[in-house]
Amino acid sequence: MTPQQSAQRLFQEKFNCTPTLNVYAPGRVNIIGEHTDYNDGFVMPCAINYGTAISGRKRDDSRFKVYAGDLQQWDEFDLAQEITPDSSKKWTGYVRGVVKFVQTHCPDFKCGADLVISGNVPLSAGLSSSASLEVAVGKFCQQLGNLPLTNTEIALIGQKAENQFVGCQCGNMDQLISALGQKDHLLMIDCRSLETIPTPIPANVAVMIVNSHVKHDLVAGEYNTRRQQCEVAAKFFGVKALRDVSLAQFKQREAELTALDPEVAKRARHVVTENQRVLDAVKALQSGNLALLGELMAQSHESMRDDFEITVPQIDYLVELAQIAIGKTGGARMTGGGFGGCIVAVAPVEKVEAVRQIIADNYAQQTGLKEDFYVCTASQGVSVC
């Protein structure tokens, strides 16, 4: 059963009536460009065929009554009163936060709703289950109140909710790709100007995701620490964000920054080189050069492992296994915020079984964890269904 079918069925079951509004927002996988979004840099994700559906209908009052189908939990809050976090149920922060900032953006939005949420994005896997939920809630509110919000604005409201209400200082990539994704395309996003360049995925190329089942929780601190270190580096270079530092400028002052703070220097090196890799990856894809894309993905993973220090041994092992099977016909790297989660692999379709097999034969035996393997389709962004 799809999330859309599940949400509609559950709504009928919980509220004894038919939903009048159904929305769906996808999760995402990032092919290259990690921890660059909050540095005003470049990223290249695609929306995937896993996401979050919301079914609901307008109420006569200002209350929101929400049922999370996958967690079998309820939440209730009132738009006529101040919306505050409920620390006992983490998921409610994403819903309440978005509704709160929709209200900030559109003060006349006061209509309540009954709604059911259902999703199939693996949780804490680095595939943006939270952004998918935020964008779905934003789109639901926009449709419910007939609000003058673009999909880009909905994405930025989702980011604001995660930053200021949930407490994770994420960038804007996850919400933007969930809102703006294009079927069969990767989307290069300039996270400062919000300009996007759609790049078609060649028909014979597969995007694979492997979930390590090492759980990460970005609110726990490491993510926010990395962001602070990047801000320190930007200040050192006298710029607004590390996006404004070229590779040549970085190399010119690298020794000086390393002497001051070797850890901050490593973080900056990752961001500066990763931005360039994204730009190079767009050209590689446009020319169908999968070997070059694979090299760039390998460099990205090494940089995340050695300079940004956000990988874990299980993730490094998955990347190593996938790369053995893929050879020079594509690439693999960790994807997402880090400290667990998933790897992404891009390779010709005929390599999929070899990648699946080498991981099935070795990963659990070596780590004691069982992976999940997905072949993904690049999908359309948020929609009313």
From Swiss-Prot:
Swiss-Prot/TrEMBL catalytic activity: alpha-D-galactose + ATP = alpha-D-galactose 1-phosphate + ADP + H(+)
Gene Ontology CC terms: cytosol
Binding site for ATP: S124, A125, G126, L127, S128, S129, S130
InterPro entries: Galactokinase, Galactokinase_bac, Galactokinase_CS, GalKase_N, GHMP_kinase_C_dom, GHMP_kinase_C_sf, GHMP_kinase_N_dom, GHMP_knse_ATP-bd_CS
The organism's place on the tree of life at top rank: Bacteria
The keyword Methyltransferase is annotated on this UniProt entry: no
Active site (record annotation): D174
Name listed for the protein in its UniProt record: Galactokinase
Organism: Pasteurella multocida (strain Pm70)
Taxonomic lineage from the root: Bacteria, Pseudomonadati, Pseudomonadota, Gammaproteobacteria, Pasteurellales
